[in-house]
Regions:
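Short, positionally conserved secondary-structure boundary motifs
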Residues: 1-63, 94-95, 109, 118, ...
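Charged, well-structured alpha/beta interaction segments
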Residues: 64, 73-74
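Structural motif
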Residues: 70-71, 85
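Hydrophobic beta-strand signal
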Residues: 74-75, 88
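Short, compositionally biased
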Residues: 83-108
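Flexible, small-/acidic-enriched active-site or ligand-binding loops
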Residues: 117-123
Length: 145
């Protein structure tokens, strides 16, 4: 099971970085070879600081969703989870990150689905100590360095 270590962020600091207006995945345009805007992670990634936490991902059960070991998840506890969301769940004493599948709710259970075909869904019913701890709003990935 992919685990997540939860961390509280310091959202009072301001880090304004230059940002390009768009980054095209096709052919580059020489007319856009300049930066003219800025990005403040606390403003742009954090909608509700009091309800936002970071989590360091440990494991590979979400790799097909692009969430890998060592990535940082930005978790917003103020968001209402909906079917298909990537969530952080507390289940039987552990935190995990998975897709939320509510399609079996009328049958008395829900599933937490991995994004890795080597893992099976986790079936959750009333006998489990379970709660949705928060919704993953963003992920931060380290590619190099």
């Amino acid at each position: 099971m992919t685990k997540i270590t939860l961390l509280k962020g310091n959202f009072k600091s301001k880090l304004a970085l230059s940002i390009a207006p768009t980054i095209k995945a096709g052919f580059p345009s020489p007319a856009e070879d300049y930066l003219h805007d800025s990005l403040d992670f606390n403003h742009d990634l954090i909608r509700n600081p009091e309800a936002t936490f970071y989590g360091r991902v440990s494991g590979d059960s979400m790799i097909e969703a692009g969430i890998c070991d060592g990535d940082i998840a930005v978790i917003d506890r103020s968001l209402m989870p909906i079917d298909g969301d990537i969530i952080v769940a507390y289940i039987n004493g552990e935190f995990t990150i998975k897709y939320l599948d509510l399609s079996h709710k009328d049958d008395g259970y829900i599933e937490l689905k991995p994004a890795n075909s080597n893992y099976h869904p986790i079936r959750i019913d009333d006998s489990d100590n379970f709660r949705v701890w928060g919704v993953v709003a963003w992920t931060i990935k380290k590619w190099r360095g």
